Amino acid sequence: MKDVRLPTLFEIIIVLGVFLALVLSFTVFLDLPIQLALFVSWFIAMLLGIRLGYSYKDLQNAIVHGISNGLEAVLILVSVGALIGTWIAGGVVPTLIYYGLEFIHPSIFLLATLIICSIMSVATGTSWGTVGTAGIAMIAIGEGLGIPLPLVAGAILSGAYFGDKLSPLSDSTVLASSLSKVDVLAHVRAMLYLSIPAYVITAILFTVVGFMYGGKNIDLDKVEFLKSSLQNTFDIHIWMLIPAVLVIVLLAMKKPSMPVIVIGALLGAIWAVVFQGMDIAHAIATAYNGFSIKTDVEFLNGLLNRGGIVGMLDSLVVIIFGLGFGGLLEKLGVLKVIVSTFEKKLTSAGNVTLSTLIVAFLANIFGCAMYVSLILTPKIMEDSYDRLHLDRRVLSRNSEVGGTLTSGMVPWSDNGIYMAGILGVSTFSYLPFMWLSFVAIGLAIIYGYTGKFIWYTKNNTVKAEKLG
């Protein structure tokens, strides 16, 4: 077998620099699909791999392994696409929009959005499902109320990621805890010390900003026109929400996400036939092609013409190519070399915390997927925590914060692509309003350097995870 070596820091800088140059030049200057940039990046990384002594077969297996790490996300993405299509056709999403316009006052809309998405994400454990259902409805309501969509998207994502990093049902919660060798409930308790203060601060911010709007930009005629248009197009009744309630209940019962979402999509198709008068073939087709309608209201068309598996294909390709690139970087040991370069400076809980957050963010940038970040960060950083006798709960918490809360900030990552596509708001537009993410990251750094809620273990084992 041919000897292989780790890359030098210079080689890493070259490869990652070329990656960023490709992504930026393709998307910003050449107006080419980001998928092409990610695909070309495979071969840039493979050239480095061959230089390091790896065979083509080794590198191909690394790509396959990287993609396999995110297959669950791919399956959920396909399922959510089907769900959105049938739920619009079945009147579920239109009913959510209607009642939101009816009962939510503009002054508290942003706070209500944060709370609604938080409750749903904690109950279901999925940020993607939350954004694909409640998120779509809140975006539509926000547009109807005249509230800037990037601000609405920030409230949606703050609520959605709150549950994704805290719910015991969340795959990210389970992944961060298991790879850090921490009991999942011990991990959740450790997260509470960070999540609750961050959530309160975020809620205050959205409340203050919400009252600044206070209905000043609201066009009441537009709201009433939108409500009447929804009633004229769909059968709007409270029982239209039964599929949504059932999905939330099943996910809260810890049933597997993908089958539950598929059941929800099937119910949406049934609702489309029974309550909306759609023929069976057309109702089923909305799961694949998405919902499509032409009304005299252009605004309504923009709200409702979406969903379907087809609508997710571009995102799927980005995720697959991104996961493959992340698999190559993991195989080549890129992040491990970066961390080892600065390891001598990791002499305090604060420095280790900051480094963990940076590694997790870099893994999202170059690994292009939250799963890559959550898998690699604990593996790369665990020795530094053990060397300082830091409890593994601190590792799992920092990995979760850095991996989950920054995943939606990267335009070419799985979360960035999905959130921007579903909400119709670009990543860079909603990024400044992801207040929960910024507050939580800031608190994690403060905790690290002040020693607040930082736990140690004398015997350098993970037994301390059971404390507190």
Swiss-Prot record:
> Which compartment or compartments is the protein found in?
Cell membrane
Listed InterPro entries: Na/H_antiport_NhaC, Na/H_Antiport_NhaC-like_C, NhaC_Na-H+_Antiporter
Q: Name one GO cellular component term.
A: plasma membrane
Molecular function as annotated in GO: sodium:proton antiporter activity
Q: What are the protein's UniProt keywords?
A: Antiport, Cell membrane, Ion transport, Membrane, Sodium, Sodium transport, Transmembrane, Transmembrane helix, Transport
Family assignment from sequence similarity: Belongs to the NhaC Na(+)/H(+) (TC 2.A.35) antiporter family.
**Role noted for this protein:** Couples proton uptake and Na(+) efflux to the substrate-product malate/lactate antiport, in an electroneutral malate-2H(+)/Na(+)-lactate exchange. Plays a role in supporting growth to high density on malate at reduced protonmotive force.
Q: Which NCBIfam families match?
A: antiport_nhaC
Q: What's the name of the protein? A: Malate-2H(+)/Na(+)-lactate antiporter
Q: Which organism is it from?
A: Bacillus subtilis (strain 168)
Task: Identify the coding gene.
Answer: mleN
